[in-house]
Every structure is written in structure tokens, then in C-alpha cells.
Amino acid sequence: TKLNNTDTIECNIKYDNSESCIRKYNILRESLKNHKMKNMEYRISLLKKLLELWDKYENLVNKSNLLHLGQSEVISSMYSYAIIRKEITYAISNLNKWVKPIKCDTPLFIGYADSYVIPEPFGLTLIFSAWNCNFLNLFVPLIQAIAAGNLCLWKPASMSPETCKVCLMILNEMPGDVVQSCAGKRLFLEGISLP
């Protein structure tokens, strides 16, 4: 379909206040306790779901880039869509290698033993999106955080409402105990003050 920059994207954004942002943060903190993000197969299934959603919303990604940045469909497909799609497929294909224990030297004072570095999730990540390249600033850290086994709280840029709408449409189809978003104009300080 031919895109023009006079349309808008139909989506009702529900802006959060600081209480709902804290509630979403607490949902993610509670879901940390079940340790399901330590399961590599679960992480791969989340990345595959994200890839499926990314493909599903390709036209809206291109349309929002046209409306917000004035990018043509070709440029948007090459930069926003293709880069993020490649990032997801790269994470899926390499996750097995990334989670393997890494053998390392054992200190002499420990004696005869084998030592390994075992990759573990850190827990909860907070992602802020910039107004000028919202898709890359959201999805690249999101993909890496999910691959690492972390949960994500996302604060979209309020200066790019069309892009924010598409991102919210995609993230709302992801499991709510893995990804949450706090959309609002003055939630920056609330986001960085969370424990």
C-alpha cells in the first residue's frame, strides 16, 4: 500500500500516571520471583513471538516513520524494520552459545577444581526511548534484555506519538509479566526513582 504523511495511526494510548507506573513495576518485580526467564527455551519463544509481531506490524512501522520522521517506505524498511528483524534472528540463533557456562582458570589457592562463569539474568531493565529513533532505541535493548533473561519496563518518548502507538500495539501483545510500558509526558523522574 502507498503511504502518505497526512494519515494518523488509529490507536488509543492510555497515558499512565506515576501510580500505574509503580504498579507495573511491581508486577515485573513479582514475576522475577518465578525465575521463568532463566529458561532458555522460554526466552527463545519470547523472541520468536516478538519477531512474529514485528513482521505483523511492518506496515505500521513504515507508516509511523513516514509520519514522524518523513522517512520513505524504502528507507524505513531498510533501517528500522530490517535492522531490528536481523537483531531478533541473530539473538535467536546465538542464544544457545550465549547461555553456555564459560570455563575459566581456577585460582591456585582453591586447589584442584573446575571454574566456570555462568551467565545469569540481572533482573529488571528500564528502557527510555528517544524521540528521533524510537524503534531502534526501544527494540534493540529490548531484544538484548529478553535474550539475557531480563524483564523490561519501557518509557516511550512523548514527542513521537505515532511511533509510540505502534510500539505500544506490539508490546501489548507480549506477556505482561515480561514487558510493561509507562506512557506519559512526565514519568521520567518516576522511572529513574524506582528501586
Where are these regions (language model features)?
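N-terminal Rossmann-like NAD(P)+-binding subdomain of aldehyde/semialdehyde dehydrogenases
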Residues: T1-Y116
